[in-house]
Amino acid sequence: MNSKCIDLKHDFSFAKCVLVEINEPVIQLHTHKFDEIAFVLKGSGIHEVDGDRYPIMRGDVFVTHGNQAHRIVEQQNLILANIIYERKHFQEIKGEFKELPGFSALFVYEPLFRKNQQFKAFLRLSSRQLENIKMLISQIKEEQEKRHSGAEKIVEYVFRQLIVKLCRYYHKSDNQSTKGILKISSAIDYMEKHFADKITIETLYNQINMSSATFRRTFKNITGSSPIDFLIRLRIEKAAEMMRKKPSIRVLEVCYSVGFENSGYFGNKFKKIIGITPKKYIKQHL
């Protein structure tokens, strides 16, 4: 089998999201500039993502980010329905649904931290749930095939319905790994919103009703990082983004704007994470 990774492309001129039915899964390792939701409609197989392999079966739903090298390496009567969507379209959807319970966990953090979770926090639909999802997929398929006026709008509308359904199912899951990533995604979302504020471990575990020890352990298991290290990296990434957007900004202003109280500590962490000092970084983007 050829293990060379290829970059797949797709034309989104019809709609911002497209249904692709797959009866013969791609076994070539590949990436792409779009993201996808895969629905296992029938059969079973082995899905490889970034070098790790996971069993998949009927009812499984998983999101794959396009920069993750992936392929199907084994399959038994496997039929997939993939909905692929442009990343800029996802940013629009993210703005709409970020507050929807289960959205960040399913679409952002489960794919991002899948390696740490060993695919234990994926979504597996019940037979009834799968039938509900298949009805929405059929609507998208019909609109794509007939292409009557306004078909692309209906496709994008039904796609949003599908996202809401998936998030509801994910949020109600009894899977313990899923419950863990739902909790931790809420803590990360809180960090994203309040990174400039004073945030303590106590602030975070109280937000999600966990004990300190359980929160620290669960966060580390899922993200591979301690909560504080994660917060520091997030703040540094926000600082770098601020500098790129406004190269005339003063380092001290950036420091305080992203939640640091000591400029020396900020400078040390910035250099450790980004690789150069804040001043040099700003000069690069003048």
Q: Each predicted region: which residue ranges?
A:
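Conserved short histidine dyad/triad with adjacent acidic residue
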Residues: 16-32
